[in-house]
Amino acid sequence: MDPYCPFDALDVWEHRRFIVADSRNFITPEFPRDFWMSPVFNLPRETAAEQVVVLQAQRTAAAAALENAAMQAAELPVDIERRLRPIERNVHEIAGALEALETAAAAAEEADAARGDEPAGGGDGGAPPGLAVAEMEVQIVRNDPPLRYDTNLPVDLLHMVYAGRGATGSSGVVFGTWYRTIQDRTITDFPLTTRSADFRDGRMSKTFMTALVLSLQACGRLYVGQRHYSAFECAVLCLYLLYRNTHGAADDSDRAPVTFGDLLGRLPRYLACLAAVIGTEGGRPQYRYRDDKLPKTQFAAGGGRYEHGALASHIVIATLMHHGVLPAAPGDVPRDASTHVNPDGVAHHDDINRAAAAFLSRGHNLFLWEDQTLLRATANTITALGVIQRLLANGNVYADRLNNRLQLGMLIPGAVPSEAIARGASGSDSGAIKSGDNNLEALCANYVLPLYRADPAVELTQLFPGLAALCLDAQAGRPVGSTRRVVDMSSGARQAALVRLTALELINRTRTNPTPVGEVIHAHDALAIQYEQGLGLLAQQARIGLGSNTKRFSAFNVSSDYDMLYFLCLGFIPQYLSAV
């Protein structure tokens, strides 16, 4: 059709024609009127039968999908196990490789330490034979020969004790009623331990005794966190600085110490200085922390710090702060008044950090207030060293040898030379002997120093597991009242923490999957807290020696000063019995 144009074409420049835009000028073809009425746009409605067929088809499809999903879910665990099996094998291989690497690294460190101790000399530079094994030799009592061990002195001696009993085995070896009680409690509370230890006929199991000694050695160790200094090293540095601040740097009878080994050799005089300083304070010293400000079931401090004032009540920490060994605790010096009270920051000068750099030179700072878990362990170590000094004071190791429960002659042929004195001062004569700290000095020089050189990360409870046993037993001997006499019939319930940690060590020997690390740390923390509390009780007692606590030490088979030395270092005193 012809378009309708209300306006005529207009002429513009250059004679071009165009149509003016207007709604009435819309050009379109004619649209069919019945277009939307065609059948394609008007389908008939579904009938009920057709709807039923559609619903049935949908239901059948859903059922088939569910069946396929169920079959796939049934096959899923098998497929997961098939995929995990090679991963587990790889993990076991990696664990074995890591263990081999750790062993190789430890051997390399020991070799480097042995080479580092070799004297720099001329010639071919070769070390004399036996130098590498000299570090593995210790001497506990001055009139006994040195003992050579492989990895762990108490454990190695246990093997020799049971081997020395011959065919009778462990049925003729006893260690005291305290160990018997712990073993019976372990069997009762943890029956699974019978799978890895031989408890037949009421014998003392060698496996159990090994696990128990390892648990005693672990009391003072810190398993949470990574540190470059041990609590034992920090304790020795603190004792030296206290002696230096109270006696002066030049008040030594011999040359000034230049190595950490020199400090270990002078531990007795440093401990005597600590005892004298605490004695001048007046009043009864408190070897306890603020329990209301410490975690109840956790030894480590969250974030490295406890609540303010939790540690300052301990007499050791208070003494170190009073004499300038420890700097001011965080928060003791107000920040707004620091310019008037502490203008040069002297209150925060840390001599321990400088001493660590001078004697250990490890390239790492040592600020005990920033790691209060280590500070707490350091104070416990100092307290334990003081207890050891009191236990060994004026000890007589030359008394009648028949009074000693431990006889090295039963274990080692020729351990006691024939020309040695078989009988010394005993009875009333032994009281006239005032050996002072001679036994402790010999122990530091011939036992502590070699063990420290072999393992600089060693802690005090690893050196003296017998002390840990005494501290754990200290609460059992606590008097109930001044006018009451109570017979203790308990079956070792106070040693639940020690029993649990020992049982975990025994159970892990037979488990494919070891106990979770968190459970082991929880058990260790409970034991460490009990050791700390018992140590405080033991340190506060006026008399802790063998003469005033015969019954307590008899539970550990200790009957003489000679036995006391070996018990502290080994953690047990073996005794042979005739077979039934």
Curated annotation (Swiss-Prot):
<feature type="compositionally biased region" description="Gly residues">
    <location>
        <begin position="119"/>
        <end position="128"/>
    </location>
</feature>
<feature type="region of interest" description="Interaction with major capsid protein/MCP">
    <location>
        <begin position="1"/>
        <end position="50"/>
    </location>
</feature>
<keyword id="KW-1160">Virus entry into host cell</keyword>
<dbReference type="GO" id="GO:0046718">
    <property type="term" value="P:symbiont entry into host cell"/>
</dbReference>
<comment type="similarity">
    <text>Belongs to the herpesviridae CVC2 protein family.</text>
</comment>
<keyword id="KW-0946">Virion</keyword>
<dbReference type="InterPro" id="IPR002493">
    <property type="entry name" value="Herpes_UL25"/>
</dbReference>
<keyword id="KW-1188">Viral release from host cell</keyword>
<dbReference type="Pfam" id="PF01499">
    <property type="entry name" value="Herpes_UL25"/>
</dbReference>
<keyword id="KW-1163">Viral penetration into host nucleus</keyword>
<protein>
    <recommendedName>
        <fullName>Capsid vertex component 2</fullName>
    </recommendedName>
</protein>
<keyword id="KW-0167">Capsid protein</keyword>
<comment type="subunit">
    <text>Heterodimerizes with CVC1. Interacts with major capsid protein/MCP and triplex capsid protein 1/TRX1 at the pentamer vertices. Interacts with the large tegument protein/LTP. Interacts with host NUP214; this interaction might be essential to the capsid docking to the host nuclear pore. Interacts with host TMEM250.</text>
</comment>
<dbReference type="GO" id="GO:0042025">
    <property type="term" value="C:host cell nucleus"/>
</dbReference>
<keyword id="KW-0231">Viral genome packaging</keyword>
<dbReference type="GO" id="GO:0075732">
    <property type="term" value="P:viral penetration into host nucleus"/>
</dbReference>
<dbReference type="GO" id="GO:0019072">
    <property type="term" value="P:viral genome packaging"/>
</dbReference>
<feature type="region of interest" description="Interaction with major capsid protein/MCP">
    <location>
        <begin position="1"/>
        <end position="49"/>
    </location>
</feature>
<keyword id="KW-1048">Host nucleus</keyword>
<feature type="region of interest" description="Disordered">
    <location>
        <begin position="108"/>
        <end position="129"/>
    </location>
</feature>
<comment type="function">
    <text>Capsid vertex-specific component that plays a role during viral DNA encapsidation, assuring correct genome cleavage and presumably stabilizing capsids that contain full-length viral genomes. Participates in the interaction between the capsid and the tegument through interaction with the large tegument protein/LTP. May mediate the capsid docking to the nuclear pore allowing entry of the viral genome into the host nucleus through binding to host nucleoporins NUP214.</text>
</comment>
<dbReference type="GO" id="GO:0043657">
    <property type="term" value="C:host cell"/>
</dbReference>
<keyword id="KW-0945">Host-virus interaction</keyword>
<dbReference type="GO" id="GO:0019028">
    <property type="term" value="C:viral capsid"/>
</dbReference>
